[in-house]
Amino acid sequence: MTKYIFVTGGVVSSLGKGIVAASLGRLLKNRGLNVTIQKFDPYINVDPGTMNPYQHGEVFVTDDGTETDLDLGHYERFIDNNLNKYSNVTTGKIYSEVLEKERHGDYLGATVQVIPHITGMIKEKIMRAGKTLGADFVITEIGGTVGDIESQPFLEAIRQMKAEVGDENVVYIHTTLVPYLHAAHEMKTKPTQHSVRELRSIGIQPNILVVRTEAPITDDMRKKIALFCDVDPSAVVESMDVPTIYSIPLRLQDQGLDQIVLDHFGVQAPKADMTAWAQMVDHMQHLSRTIKIALVGKYVALHDAYISVAEALQHAGYPVDANIDLQMIDAEKITDDNVQDVLGSADGIIVPGGFGDRGIEGMITAIKYAREQDVPFLGICLGMQVASIEFARDVLGYADANSTEMNPDTSHKIIDLMADQADVHEMGGTQRLGLYPCKLKAGSRAAAAYDNQEMIQERHRHRYEFNNQYRDEMTAKGLVFSGTSPDDHLVEVIELPEKKFFVAAQYHPEFLSRPNRPEGLFRDFVAAASREVKD
């Protein structure tokens, strides 16, 4: 029988529910158990694909092409499993599917209601997540905060799950806050008590409380929380701020979180061997060097807009014993006059993905600087397209070279709309999304990054592509097209082999990076940047 673990949050948002879910997933996986994780987001958007990065942060893409919440990136990095479309579900998705079934007559004329139809669809998504990925344990994070009107259908659905599959197959974990009042020099448990009372009022009694704190909670405080919230004192687990999120599984294991969960389920499993993970975390906290990487982007005011890029860079720093000092540079503020001042101290330059024409000229200036000054450079998605435009302008001499996304009337369409996108008018879920094969050129930097494999699989999110009319001309000037689709039609990777490192990919390599297994392009880019550090 599949076991279900539900993670809710109270008091305030951003308590780290996703990291708690991911950490528990890691602990259970290291016990030899099959685990998957999913998140329910209570907003009306069908998916986050069309949402403003400043509001939502990064859009994470799964193998099957689903545009998801950034928490799925954390899930994949922690449990090292690739997730799918059942791993992120929104209110909008649930309602759209229910309404579609109603239009098809599937409900046989019944009055369609939140209960049972919406809650039934939610439960179906929960169960299907485990079935499609062959998981024995499904960890489900409920987005938002208990008490929010938007979350009520999800909370009602997970309440019903206990009756449907049995108490012995369901665990409720509630994350909450124990704030420290500096003026009074005192920690307060009342917000946690009220949050649990709110959860209990809708029929959910948490089995475990994970309390976010600035300082350790005392035994007396633990007993007080347990008494008022009707849980065992051992099930009050503290989650303090830590230097790296990857240490949280170790902190939770020390407090027996995974064992408490398994005891409730009556499941016997070997203790999680976290030796390799602990060694990795120890290494992360004792890095001897610092590498300065300039990220030139459009959404730099919000770090979460590039969270997977930032994580992939940190992962790539570990093999060279280096911490990454990531300098977020607003592309709009880069000009020919100040580029040296802005980027002169960087050991490497990265231009990540994005959409629209804002900041494009600054990105072109930054890439020109990297190419001419031989600063290690990595371009991703839009970064690859802009690198192609820069080469056309400054090497081929086509001053007005551009992408038709930025300038439909350009006479040199270096980047153009993909043929199968010409008749697409919907914005959401219509790009080239998900895992696609990429053929690598033998002897190239790209091939070396992937251990000289001939074919790799990478995740994409774009609707524009390189215009093959310019391929021969650029090749003659030294640009190498080192990665293409298997039929050689779509350009996937470009590089300048004579440079220390100048590689750009149409796909998103950051989505497949892991803390214990850095992604190849990021690894080699950071290694090249490490050789630029002035010790």
From Swiss-Prot:
Q: Does the keyword NADP apply?
A: no
The record's top EC class is ligase
Sites binding ATP sit at 14-19, 71
Pathway given in the UniProt record = Pyrimidine metabolism; CTP biosynthesis via de novo pathway; CTP from UDP: step 2/2
Q: Where is the Glutamine amidotransferase type-1 domain?
A: 292-535
The EC designation for this entry is: 6.3.4.2
| Residues that coordinate or bind Mg(2+) | 71, 141
Query: Matching SUPFAM superfamilies, A to Z?
Result: Class I glutamine amidotransferase-like, P-loop containing nucleoside triphosphate hydrolases
Q: How does it assemble?
A: Homotetramer.
Family in the record: Belongs to the CTP synthase family.
Biological role stated in the UniProt entry: Catalyzes the ATP-dependent amination of UTP to CTP with either L-glutamine or ammonia as the source of nitrogen. Regulates intracellular CTP levels through interactions with the four ribonucleotide triphosphates.
Name the chain's protein: CTP synthase
- State the organism named in the record: Levilactobacillus brevis (strain ATCC 367 / BCRC 12310 / CIP 105137 / JCM 1170 / LMG 11437 / NCIMB 947 / NCTC 947)
**Underlying gene:** pyrG
